[in-house]
Amino acid sequence: MHQVSKFFSALLITVTGTTAPSLAGDNVILETVRAAESRLGGRIGISVHDTGSDERWDYRADERFPLSSTFKPFACAAVLARIESGAERLHRVVEFEEQDLVTYSPVTETRVTTVGMTIAELCEATITLSDNTAGNLILESLGGPSALTDFMRTIGDMTTRLDRWETDLNEGTPGDKRDTTTPHAAAQSLQQLLMGPTLSAGSREQLTTWMENDKVADALLRSALPEGWRIADKTGAGGHGARSIIAMVWPPASQPVVIAIYMAENDASFADRNQAIAEIGAAIVETVGN
């Protein structure tokens, strides 16, 4: 794994302007998180699970952080579960009007004068481009934010909660428990939905495909992956320095690694927050690749 080690060092030189620090063994992930937290301020929480070795790395993993747009794969998983039960149809057309549009809706704002969008198109838009109106329409199809919370409880997640709609849910006020999760809960739920028995094989494949096609995440974990590694992910961002990503990563010829990274309560720039996640991603590659 010498090539990955060199890749990790090169990435840190690129994103920080310094050589990779001397970090011991498995602590490379946690030390990288602590260094990023010290530099950015606020809090960073992670939960990483190598499903092949069953090793875990947690830091502030049971502290609450704003969900932001990381709720979107969970919402679409709830839709897929409803489709399996016969309560929804993937190709049902949802009509909407200009008054339904909210900030950052790159797909739905171009379709508002058409006959609407299918449930499948809405999930694709809200996961791959983080379209906020599409996210709201998916939530509406479920019965609102509380219905997503109820779904999370059915899969064993007693922590994650959604209370508001886009874009209010991105407020991220420190200490506000609304619209929050913990890194541990988010990682476990993602693993359950992409690998567990909650969804059928076909639904798991569909959710994975949507997340693999994420088009707004290149500067984060994807920038840290060597050639041949696969990733399915979803990012989030909000007020008070909130930035997040949930992901499943497949090293070549290995079992997947589940990752949840959340940050909050900092004054760092958007680019600096992205850089920190890329650094943590490089540390994860360095650790699980050995």
Model-derived regions: residue spans:
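Mid-domain, small-residue-enriched loop/turn segments at the edges of structured enzyme/sensor domains
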Residues: R43, T118, C123, N136-T198
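Short, conserved catalytic-motif segment at the N-terminal edge
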Residues: L40-F65, E88
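Structured C-terminal helix/loop/strand segments within mature extracytoplasmic catalytic/sensor domains
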Residues: D26-R39, G52, E140-S141, P145-S146, ...
